[in-house]
Amino acid sequence: NVNIGVWTKLFKAKTIKGIEYDKAIRINEDKLFIFEALMKAEKYVVYDVSKYNYIQREVSATRKFDDRWFDTLDVADYMLELIKKEKPELLRWAEINQIKVYYWLLLMLFRNHDAVEMYSKQYNRVVCLLKKAKLLKISKYISRNMFLQILLIKVSEPLFKRIKGRG
């Protein structure tokens, strides 16, 4: 499990040469940058020690929900496609990442008043992917709560919405 903050990393110049931030991605651009760097890296080392204090403000851009958050779906989809082409042996992990990202965004939609209605097209995209998820294949890699909620979406999306207070 690698933290996605670029500010927690040191890279050799040759590893990140040619990798640029995608200016079209408004949130999760650092996750994509790290992913591309790891795809190029010959090896990496995780040194689990805190040497940096990080403060998150309540008014931070990453606290407020808006359409930028849907960029996380595009990043997860891109990562999956790149893994399929370049490192198929990691496909299961890319699929799990994609499902977790979509699930997390679904929860964000329900936590923000009127977001499900306001972003109905994106909501449908999220639900469609989660309904197709092969839960038994990934059940040991996700939490029991996530498993049960995705299962409920597969069985009865209206019941899921009612339980979440939006149906």
For each of these PLM feature ranges, what is it?
Residues 50-58, 63-89, 104, 108, ...:
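Catalytic core of nucleotide-sugar-dependent glycosyltransferases
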Residues 99-102:
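GST superfamily/GST-like fold recognition
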Residues 111-167:
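Membrane-interface aromatic/basic loop that binds lipid-linked glycans or pyrophosphate carriers
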Residues 89-97:
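All-alpha amphipathic helical-bundle segments outside canonical DNA-binding/catalytic cores
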Residues 1-44, 55-65, 69:
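Donor-binding/catalytic cores of nucleotide-activated saccharide
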Residues 43-44, 89, 136:
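A general structural signal for well-ordered secondary-structure junctions
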Residues 42, 49-50:
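Extended, low-polarity segments enriched in aliphatic/aromatic residues
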